[in-house]
Amino acid sequence: MNINRNRLVSNLIFISILVFFDQWSKYLVVTYVRLGTEYLSFFGDLFKIIHVRNTGVLFSLGSNIDSSLKNLFFLIIPIIILVFVFSFSLKENNKVSRFALILILSGGIGNIIDRLFRPLGVVDFLDVKFFGIFGLQRWPTFNFADSYVVVGMIVFIIYDLFTKDKSTNL
């Protein structure tokens, strides 16, 4: 595989910056906010910083499954997927797609670091009021790594939907 050295270096730098910011924010929360407590509230209760842990995945799904299965589904499989995403990002020529892939990769790495080194689970701390949308008064608490993954997926999907080759008529 012919890898563009500049692309590799720029990807690694960008990933490192995003992962550092995610881990630094989690470090601050773990250091200064007692687990299970609210630290700050902005605009009434629209946005809160609260320290919680998540031993599952999105919306705490899988929190109650056996720990050996958690290692398989929440560590091993995601690491394999991230290796493929990284190799794909190196081959991707489109800057928007590469940006989206790097966001997804950075978020995945940030949460895998928590799974490996934080026995209480992934640190979540961003809490947003959701005004009853989808039956939720508050969106499930999340972190910057989660945001990277979601924004990366949205960018990737929107870009893919609106830049498909329009010359193909079905």
From Swiss-Prot:
Its main location: membrane. InterPro entries: Peptidase_A8. GO terms for molecular function: aspartic-type endopeptidase activity. It is an enzyme of class 3 (hydrolase). This is Lipoprotein signal peptidase. Pfam families: Peptidase_A8 (PF01252). The chain crosses the membrane at residues 13-33, 72-92, 96-113, 116-136, 142-162. It catalyses: Release of signal peptides from bacterial membrane prolipoproteins. Hydrolyzes -Xaa-Yaa-Zaa-|-(S,diacylglyceryl)Cys-, in which Xaa is hydrophobic (preferably Leu), and Yaa (Ala or Ser) and Zaa (Gly or Ala) have small, neutral side chains. The active site is at residues 124, 146. GO terms for biological process: proteolysis. Pathway: Protein modification; lipoprotein biosynthesis (signal peptide cleavage). Its EC number is 3.4.23.36. It is found in: Cell inner membrane. It comes from Borrelia duttonii (strain Ly). Belongs to the peptidase A8 family. The lineage of its organism: Bacteria, Pseudomonadati, Spirochaetota, Spirochaetia, Spirochaetales. It comes from the Bacteria. This protein specifically catalyzes the removal of signal peptides from prolipoproteins. It is a multi-pass membrane protein.
